Amino acid sequence: MTETLFALTNDDAGGSAPELFEELLDFLDAQQVPVTFFVLPHGQGTPLDSKPEWMALLKRALKSGHELQLHAFDHSSTFEFGVPPDFMLDIIPDAKARWEREPEVVQQAHTLELMSDRIARGKAIFERALGYAPTGFRGPCLSMSANTYQALANHGFVWSSNEVVNPMGWRYINKDYDAGEPWQPNVPPHPYRYTAGIIEIPMVSEYTWYLTPEDMDRHYDLIRSDFDRVRAVGGTFLTLSHYYAMTGEWTTGLRVYERLFEYARSLGDVRFVTVSRLLDAYGVPD
């Protein structure tokens, strides 16, 4: 493939602060960049189709060419669909302490039956609200398990985006700028066949978590460096973000992406796509 596919993803639509989600939609309209939003079907204990403000915004997102896929069920637990990776637990000390204290208890909640039930309930609300079945999934806090992947396959899901290429974005969240976290050797920066036949489409990292203007250059340097490295190996550039952590008083995150979009466009061989379009174009290498 001669072009680089760039897919921005964004989590937790359907949760709190819809006005901040609307701010992100306005930014994306101006930038003409499609995004894959991972939507909470039962956020804050309320079904998505009982939230008229969110329904209007999500319909606007679809009309603008964005993609909506399933995110968790209600995002009520760090361990909702499995155990998050270590670099994620490092920024959630209470969850890390619980995992270290009672791993058997945590894992008891990840049976195939329980994972299947949560996915089925979330999928049903999603279909009822939006009129189609989701084919992609992301767990809350990147929490996943083998049983979750099997349950996704059993419910007709095609792909997930939960694995991480470069954990440094989370080290930056903890202000651990000198961690030297390497790219993960077992996570390629492109789609590949994973557990239970599900296609995994990894994210490279998260770069825009509650940034201040003083963070701008450091985080832009990280995201551009990762982008250039992905291009050098012929991979796909998929990033994670959260609408409420890059809007409102935290719009430095939008400025980081504004700079990266401008840089990417200057190269002339970059295409902005949703995750499903990325998969259609790139395929799954043998």
Task: Specify the residue positions occupied by each region the protein language model found.
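Active-site beta->alpha N-cap acidic-glycine motif
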Residues: 1-67, 76-77, 128, 269, ...
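Acidic (Asp/Glu)-rich catalytic clusters
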Residues: 22-33, 48-73, 83-93, 153, ...
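CE4/NodB-like, metal-dependent polysaccharide N-deacetylase domain
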Residues: 28-34, 96-145, 201, 229-240
